Amino acid sequence: MAASSTCSSGTGPATSRSPRGNPDLTVKVSAASAEHLRRLNERLGALVVGRRLYDMTNAWGGRHPLDLTTVVVTHQRPDDRPEDDENFVFVTTGIEDAVAKAREIADGKDVGVNGGEIARQCFDAGLLDEVHVDLVPVFLGSGIPLLGMIEDAPVELDGPISVTQGKGVTHLGYRVRK
């Protein structure tokens, strides 16, 4: 299992945590959200993220909270990570190579993609099969768009293939129409 979740009975908060991830990054979610995240995370064998997210999170304290090897797409390897290890692999040759490396690491399991720019690059390269969005009722007013400008927009989605109502969040899953 990529991440474990412990759920309380009823609708009270549950704790979603990773056995080897950073315990400071434990999140409290509803039982429904914890179950949704557990099911989704069980499918994953590796992650692909961009350098901006890697830097913003300070490398998640050394290990992604989902306890998966994380492939980081970057133009330049960080100075403090001269070698790849079980936690992070750095790819400087583009999104296709990063996803191929993540598929190799995932060993038959799904590859998760996180970060709007990386998701957009995957859309543009035709690499996404599903999209999972966590809809939270908050308008931020500014910031980085979730996906930016997709080259072959509009991208049509089938579904939803999953809908989970958590507390203050709706988890939605769609298949990418190819």
What is the meaning of each model-derived region?
Residues 1-178:
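Enzymes that bind and transform nitrogen-containing heteroaromatic metabolites
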